[in-house]
Each structure stands twice: as structure tokens, then as C-alpha cells.
């Protein structure tokens, strides 16, 4: 007996016909094709069938050869004739044709009715057990328990709302309508397409949600690999519409940072819809490598944390593209519970949220308060092209939670690039439109446009305090009547950059400021404000015309530079400049550097500020060695003492402290601030014609003596001189030098020796400078207000030497001497009259002459 031939083509016949049918025949009914294109598709389809038929004929000939060689011809003929007479052969042909038409194995082939009444669960189970692709035709197919999906399942329907799979009213609690067979370790290679899953939650009564874990969703995929879900509608769900999760019926809570074993992965959800759900429409847990695109989730049954799309505990590497949500608590919520790892590395490429409470809500529960541990997993969300339309909470979700366009809590590494928020009813959202809060950090909001939120407190608010956000970049924002404060930064926020903010506030209810920050150290630039009373309010100070603030190392208009400290700057300079320490800078200079804090070099070259609080201006080759040293227009010079200033000099080196020096190649003058002394190498001249030397004297009677009177001494005080008395001087207004003013303190403020010399003590300043300081007098009261002699009526400037204007009578002659009568000069033997400048008149009672007093 010959060996029975292997009929490989017969074994694959059903699968091949299905593939050909799926690929070619439906195009004949595609109205987007022209008639010529339709005909070409059909002809190509028939040609492919012909190829398969030829191969089948070749294998059938092998069968016939085997039958004939082994003498089985009579048996085969007899069997075929009996099948034909009994109708079995005809039924077989009809069944094959029907299954081909229904795209694989139809559930009706296995007895399904699809009449909305009959329990079709066994038909589904048998069809799936056949191993062939299963087709669900038009109809409502009732099932009394969940449908299990083994590996390598293909289940395709006649379309959403055409092919409906629905729970019967008799189904109890805990069942999911459709789920993979092995809920612990999972299955693989599952394809679901084109039907509706109706959870019939109404059978359980009003307000019923899931009993716990991942049970009671319309579609549950647990621990599966390679799952494609397309054109599925999930309605009236007890828990979720579609749930992608790890193995097991209960969601694991293993602590932050610990993901569950057996994740689902390589999941594709496309063009699906969820509505009437009790928790979330489409959700993921502890799974990875998931794509969700072109889906619509809307109008949940309940008002708890019911989100259109929820990427939950332990989910990672998830991409959501061009989806839409409506009427949910969260349009997209990316989150985790406190004892589970947060969803991370999530990408959103386009989403439209319509009338959700919080269109985009990113949070890690249990990690928001200042006393909570910092989340280790809430990281990496990138979202672009987000749209939020009329966010509101008319239904009272989450105990009347406040609406938001976007809320970020506890996450770090969040990038938003393109977010549009719009409302035509400003009363729907009256608090904050976009918030970064509750320990969120390292977030970037770029390309944000908000329109119509004219009753809201804040357009964008980085909430401060002990659990505030931090490290936030806000850029390229357009605010159209949105927020009394356009961008608001709370207290304690140390790292914020706000750039290119444009706001129109003339339609806002009581606008305050386009940008407002509690702290004084944000980075701010590029503000454009219309209709706001002030463009920027920083640390309580208003800047009506805008403000530019930068933090960190700063270099501008500079070809190249060396090291710049984070609190240093170099501007308008050429190569070789450094500002390597904090609070230092180099401006319009070359080859210059600051080496100590709080130092500045400007308009200089090859100079160095080595000490703290150094300043070098307009100098070449200048060096400031110690603190509080300065060189201004001083080249090739060195200031080596504390509080030392060199002005307009060349080639001098100074030591000592609290001094001002100048010179050329040597020191030519010095102001000693420590001791109040002035030194000059050459002549000291006056800048006017004043020509006498004077001292302060007190009048004997305490009254004013007018200018030009000759005075004498009595009891150490002055009065008008009389004839024959010793004239000491003249009351003068032209003294070039005046001594004894006691300008700064009471003359008895310090102790003096018997000769009037000051008694000193040696002290050391806080910066280490040693010097001699006058000993304070125990009789001196520093709390008393001191009035200098120049402001007291009893004290007078008396010219003692020089050319002084004197009151004269009619006897005085040029070239003669003078005497005094009642303080008025008369002809005598004292001094010399140089010139009579105002002749004597009886009306005035005196004249004026210039007298050389010596």
C-alpha cells in the first residue's frame, strides 16, 4: 500500500481564500474607486483564485492516484454517491461557500442566532475553538458569560453597531464581556475588529461600578502580547470599556517604582469608541509598548474619576495619537495610586477634549503633600497639539472638582508643546486654567494659547508653598482675555523661566498683571501686554512697561570667553575675559578677569580684580589686589590695600587702606579717609578769587556780627573792635581756607591731651585693617543731634590773613592804614588799604575797601 500524500494546500485552503477575500473582493464595493479600478481589482482577485485552484487540482490528482493504486476507487465512489443521495455533499459545498462569504468561520455556522434573545455563547466558543478566523455577522448576539480569547484568535464583525455582542440580563457580577483565556500568564496574537461590545450594565441597576480589580470591563486584555484592536465599540460598561493590564484579576500595588510581572505589550488600539462606562473608557495598567490612535471616549455613566483615556499604574512607553474625549472627568489622565508606580514615558500626539472637567490631568496620588515621599516613577510625559474646548463640571464629577485645561501634579520631565484652551462661557471655569502644582518639577509649557477664560483667576499658575512646583519653563504663550493674572508664580518657586508672553486683558473681569511672581528671581523676557494694568509684578513691585530678568551665567555680544560663573556675566567683550566667581562681571573689555566675588571690570584691558568688591573702570593693565579696591582711568597701576581707590593715574602702586590716590609714575596726592587728611606733592589752589585764610570764632554776646566788621577778642570770643584795640581779623565771606568749623561732630567728642592733640587707640576693622582711632570722650552723647558751627548764628568766619573786604568810614584812604571804631575801619596805622571798591556814603553809613590783613 502506498503512502497517503500530504495535502498541504488543502489544509491551507480556507485560510488562503479568506486572505484573498479580505484583500481584493471588498474593493469591488468601495465607492471611492472608479468602475475601471473596481474591475481591475476583481480580475486580479479571480486570477489569484485561479492560481490556488490549479495547485489544488495538482494535489487532488495525487489523491486520485493514491486511491486507484490502493484499490480504493469503488469505496470512494460508493461513499460519494451516498453523500450525494443524502444531500451531505450539497450541504458541504453550501457551507464552504457561506463561510467564505462570511470571511472565515461564521458564528452562525455553529448555531448562533443573533436575534437579541438566544444565548449564543456556545456558538462563539465553538467557532473560536475551530482555530479559524471567526466572523460575527449582522445581529445582536446575547451571551450568558464572558467570551474567552485563546492565542492566535481572529474575531471580526460586520461593523460597529451592526454586529453587537451583549451580556444577557441573567449574567451575575465579576464577569468581563470579552477577555483573553489565560488571565495569569497571558496569550498572544489576538486580532479583534468591527463589532460592538455591550456590557448591559443596566441589568445591575443604577450607579453600579466594578466589584474590584480588572473585573467587569467590556474588553480585558491581561498579560498578552501582540494584540490588535480595531473598530471596536464598548458601550454600557460596568467598569472599563477597554482595559489593557498585566496578569491577574486584581491590579497589583507593589509600591512606587516596582512594576508588576507579566505585562501586556505590543498592543494596538485603533478607531475604537467607548461610552457609558463606570470608570474609564480606554485604560492601561502595568503594560508597555501600546499605541492608542483615532479613538473616541465619551459620556461615562457615573461621576467619579471617570476618564476618557486613563494611562494608569505602571504603564510605560504608551503613545496616544489623534484621539477625542467628551463629557468625562479627565480627557486624558496619566496617573498612579500612591502604592503603585506612576505611568511614565508617555507620548501624546494630538488630542481633542470637549467639555471634560480636566482635559489633561497628570498626577501621582499620594505624592502631592510636602510630607509625602517624592515620586520615583512619575516622569517623562511629552504632549503636543492638545485641544481643550469648554472645560466644565456641570455634572459634578469628583465632588464638584474645579475644571482645568491642564493640571500637572508630582510629575517631572513634562513637556507640553502646543496646547489650546477655548471657552465661550467664562462662567464655566473661574479659578485656574492651567496649573503646575503639588511638587511637579522640570516642566516645560511651550506654545500655549488660552481664549475666553475672562473670569478665571489665573491663566497659568505654578502653585507655590511647601508642596509647590519648581523648575518650570513657560514660553510662547498667547492669552486672549484669560486670567486676571496671565501667568502667576507662587511663593518658594526658585527656578522659573517666563519668555515671550503675549496677553490681551481688556475683556477680563478686573485684570491685574500679565505676569506675577512672588519671588524676585524668575527669568522673564519678551512680555507684550494690552489691557493689563501692569505687565509684570515681581516680588510686589509693578513694572508697567515690561521687564527682562535673566539668571545664571550670562554672555552677550562677546566673541568668546573663559569660564563664567552661574552668577557672573560677560558682555560686549572680546576673547580672554573671565567672570569665574559669583556676583562678578566683565563689560566692554578684553583679556580681563574677575577672580573674587562682587567684582566688576568695565571698559578695560588686561586687567584683573583679585579681591572682593573690586572695581576697575576704563583702565589698562590695572590690578586690584585686596577687597574694596577700585581703579578708575588708572593704567599700569596696582591697588594693594583695602578700600583703596586710584583715580586718573598711570604706573602707581598704592598700599594702606581707606585712601584715594592719584599720580603719574608716582603718587602725587592722597585723601586719607581713615584719618581725614589730605596730602599733595605740589601746589593747592582755589578755583575762584577768594583770597583769605580764616577760622571760626564765637561772638561774645551770641549775636550775629555782619560781614566786613573788624573784630577783636574778649574772653576768647569776638566782638566789634574799637579804636586802639588789637584787631585780629574781619568777618569774611571770601575765605579760601576755613578752620575750626567742627563740621562732623562736637569738638569735645574725643579725648585730647593738654596741648589739644587727639588721644588715639589702635583697632582692627572687620576686613582686617589695623588703624588708630580717636578715643571717644565719656562726656560725648552720640544720640544727641549735632549742628555744625557753620549753621549756628553765634559762630563766625573771621578772616585772619589775606585780602579781605572791610567796612570803612569817610576817612579811609587807599595806601593808608586803618584803625577801628565800632568795628568800622577808620584812618589809622594797622594793615594796608589796597583799594576802595565802594566809596563811603552817608545813606549807607559805610563804604567797602579791600584791606591786606597780616
Curated annotation (Swiss-Prot):
Compartment annotation: Virion
Single GO molecular function:
ATP binding
Keywords assigned by UniProt, alphabetized: ATP-binding, Degradation of host cell envelope components during virus entry, Host-virus interaction, Late protein, Magnesium, Metal-binding, Nucleotide-binding, Repeat, Viral attachment to host adhesion receptor, Viral attachment to host cell, Viral tail fiber protein, Viral tail protein, Virion, Virus entry into host cell
Cofactor(s) in the UniProt record: Mg(2+)
Q: How is the cofactor bound?
A: Binds 1 zinc ion per subunit.
Q: Which Gene Ontology cellular component annotation is one that this UniProt entry carries? A: virus tail, fiber
Site: Cleavage. Where? 691-692
Give the GO biological process terms: adhesion receptor-mediated virion attachment to host cell; symbiont entry into host cell via disruption of host cell envelope; virion attachment to host cell
- What are the binding positions for ATP in this chain? 746-795
Pfam families, alphabetically?
Answer: Pect-lyase_RHGA_epim, Peptidase_G2
Q: Which residues form the active site?
A: 695 (nucleophile)
Positions binding Mg(2+) in this chain are: 285, 310, 312
Domain note = The N-terminus has three domains that function to attach the appendages to the phage, digest the cell wall teichoic acids, and bind irreversibly to the host. The C-terminus is an autochaperone that aids trimerization.
Assembly and oligomerization: Homotrimer. Each appendage is a homotrimer of gp12*.
Described purpose of this protein according to its UniProt entry: Structural component of the 12 appendages that hang from the lower collar. Adhesion protein that binds to the host cell surface during virus attachment and mediates teichoic acids degradation.
Q: What is this protein called?
A: Pre-neck appendage protein
Gene name as annotated: 12
